[in-house]
Amino acid sequence: MEQQIHQAVEIALSGTADPTLKNQAFEFINHIKSTEEGYKACVDILIKSSNESINDGLKFFVYQVIDENIDKLSQEQVFTLNQELFKCLSSYINNNLQDPTHLRNKFAQILAKQFCQVYINIYPNFIKDLLELINVSEATSTNPNNLLAIDYYTRVLIGIHSEIGDKYITRSQEIHNRNNLLKDAIRTQDMQQMVTSWIQILTNPSFAHSEEILNNTLKIVGQYVSWMEISLFISPEFINTVFSFLQNSKLRNTTCETLIDIISKKMAPQNKLELLSLLNLTEFIGTLNLIEKNKNDDDDEDEDVEFMEFVAKLLNQIGQELLIVLENQSGLLEQVNAQLFKLWPAILGCLNHNYDDVSQNVFPFLQQFLTLSKKNPQLYTVDLMSTLLNKLILKMRFDDDDDGVSDEDTQAQFLDFRAKLKSFQDTIALLEPQLYLEAIPVIINESIFETNVDDVNWRKVELGLYQLNGFSDSIRNNVFQISRNEINQSKPYLIFQEFLIKLINSDLIMKINHPMIQSNFFELIVKHYNFLVSRESNFELIIKILQIFTSPLGLFNENEKVRIRSWYLFFRFIKLTKPKLDNEALIESIVVKMQPLLVIKAELPTKDEDDDIVENGNFNNQQYLFETMGLLISLIPNELSQLKSKLIDLIFQPIFNDLEKCISIPESQREPIVILQAHHSLQAIGTLVRGYDYESGLKFLPDVVAKIDNAAQVVLITLENFSSHEMIRDATRFAFARFIPIFKSDNDNNNKNNLIISQHLSKLITIIWSSSNLKISEYSDFLSFLGQIVHNFRTDDNIYQLLNNFITPLFQKIFQVLQNPVTEDENLRPDIIRDKNSLKRATLNFISSIVMNHLSSLLITESNKQELPEIIGKVFEYSYDLSDTTTSKLAIVQLTNFVNVFGGSGGKLDDKEDKYSENLPPIEGIDEFLINKVINLSFELPFQKQEFNLNDAQYRLIAQEIAILLKSFELKKHDEFIVVLSNYLLNMGLSQDLCNDFCLNLHNLDLKDFKKYFISFINKMKSGK
């Protein structure tokens, strides 16, 4: 079998072996791993390997098999294996067998695992035998066998740590308990000798050049110190030796980690303080002069920076341990402060380091210190906070080698780094608001306003803008603890307002051609618009800001990122400030200046390397400009009506020309880009009108309404010519949804235009509805659009007639679409089911829109009353369907609406606000129909549907809606409903007492209490109690 194993491993590792043969080899290998016969064969191979050479691949496989079988062995087998492993180890050492690192690690891992099996009950001399093998006290650098022995020794101890001491590995309680017993046994039997051996290795000059052994030994000290006796580790000889490694470039990083592990050991506060005082690490690190070197050397070598990161981690841990001492024993404040006083220069030096990776390693200490300072102000002095604040602010500045543009990842990392610094600054502001109030304005003033414009550093100005923005946040968060009524007259508020005004009036921003400055300026202005609108005297500042926005600094910026962002910010600024624009020349110049930005150029989307659709072009952002144009024109006083009309034409006409070009292209020659261009043009029209409508309460001028009417005609002509394209239908609905508020306003004030509006909508509905390729999602959007029409024109006779003619074909088509089976690609099935559920909800919402806007008469006119039973039937059907609980709940809500308008007056529509209902005859039998169907639904749904579980919030909501439905009917029909309900419950087998109780509660309880009762009733009946 040994030969077979050898061959199988060779084939498995071969890159040229026949695939079939390779599969057979893997099957054989897996068989070997899982059988006792295979395990024994591998042990035999291992025994022979101590005397004869085998290849590395086979040896690693043998190690794997043994490793995977150790936990399955009997005690006798474990004992035997232990003997063989030690024989192998002894042979490797005596023969100086220099296996590759991965083989040595694997063998050490096996020994570590074996240790866990044998140390307590089977072979307590495990560690003693290891120590005897290495004979560290007689080790010399000229004895290679001894070096190999110690190498294996350190690897085995690292493996043992992984098995019993690594706190980052999750273990079962059983293994956790076993590990505690192993640690106890080590402490009792071998701890003293183990620690002595480590000290001997570290202090033996023979190993001075054996870096891997020393590194591993330092790691071991750090790993084991957490659960061993600390006194064994802190002899002067040991400490001095460890400290000396801080000056060894190959060992110093590990040394820092070891020292962190030593000082992190859990112990009583007083003992921890004594340990830190004894080690006196801060003073020793100071002797290395690392901080001063950083100040004077801008060209640190990489390894020096890496070492400084470890030193920073060590200093951070010292600080955190001191703070933990204070948290656990507040009486030690004086001693803690004394040690912190010695620590702060090194901490501040790390914070001030040229490399952010070094600085952020002391962040945990700073966070802990500032948090604790809130509870314990004696922990700091104002001078310390002042120094720390200055260091934090200086560190927030962009590095001199960062241009702030090229590398977005680097910039994102820095902004995240700066955000952490800012959180520390904010805490200092809370602790010492007066210090903050004195320091920050000085920084802002020096950074922005005392800068030589001809020799300006953008990084300095950017820091000033950042601090100015942060200063306003401090005011908003009331860091200065000022009464709300006095904030606007407070010193901080006035300082900020003065800075903001000074910034706007300054030429500095205009002269610094850097994206960060330009972008931050506009963000700052828009964020603090309320400082500008709070006073009439600031109107000139707003005008100046408009001019800056429309300069090459903003909307026309050469940097695309700044340019695109400024389009949105310009829109936000106009919308928030709503300036009174009565200067014709200024307004016209702004609009004319912006015209080049309003040229629409469609670009087809592409796919990226992941096959995802990527939108091209800037049209989505460009829409902010169109919306802004609409808003600007709406802000022009009505006295300047000619200017309004002129500017609307100025913006609309290029779009109309674009649409005319698109329409003129024969359908057979229309490329996708033509359709997209037409879509963008329609979207732009709708977006501009949406901007105009932002000024709520406006009375729209007849000339303006006429312009919108003309735009509506252009949109409809475009739709006629592109009716088969979904994106054109979508854009048309989008545009008309924005026209409606203006048409409605004019409709309310000018009845002669009613017919024109209804004609537009009639044509729109007809064209869209006649399209043969409508998607399910489009039906949902269309119903939502119709709901908007119902709401806005509920009193318009022409619109009523339009809807009356359309209701029946609408519902018939919708129900047909929902009834159609899924015939498309099976992969599309989830999407189609989702879209159909959305359409059901859209249908229910449309019904709700009809009822809630007092147009229920539409459902019972001569044209539509034949469809009413089908509509009500579908609503009941959706109520019963619990595969989509949201739809079910919504359907029950609509049943309540039906009950309220049809369920109480003998079939006569019961809605006094429905002006069209009076001349309509009652619907015979609808009362009885609804009563029976509602009662059936109310009890079949919770009691016959197995999935109906009141522990699920969705089903609980449905139950509450059923309670509302029952209560609504009871309020409508009173005793008549109670009688039918009582008979139903008795027929279903409910006792007379329970039936009486239910009907009595339905009659007597208010809605809130009946909902609770109904939930309780369902729970009680379903549990059988």
From Swiss-Prot:
Key word tRNA processing present: yes
Cellular component per GO, a single term: nuclear matrix
Record key words, sorted: Cytoplasm, Nucleus, RNA-binding, Transport, tRNA processing, tRNA-binding
Subcellular location: Nucleus; Cytoplasm
Recorded GO MF terms: small GTPase binding; tRNA binding
GO biological process: tRNA processing; tRNA re-export from nucleus
Keyword tRNA processing: yes
InterPro entries xrefs: ARM-like, ARM-type_fold, Exportin-1/Importin-b-like, Exportin-T_C, XPOT
One Pfam family named in its UniProt record: Exportin-T
Superkingdom, taxonomy of origin: Eukaryota
Main location: nucleus
Similarity section: Belongs to the exportin family.
Annotated function: tRNA nucleus export receptor which facilitates tRNA translocation across the nuclear pore complex. Involved in pre-tRNA splicing, probably by affecting the interaction of pre-tRNA with splicing endonuclease.
Protein name: Exportin-T
Lineage, uppermost ranks: Eukaryota, Fungi, Dikarya, Ascomycota, Saccharomycotina
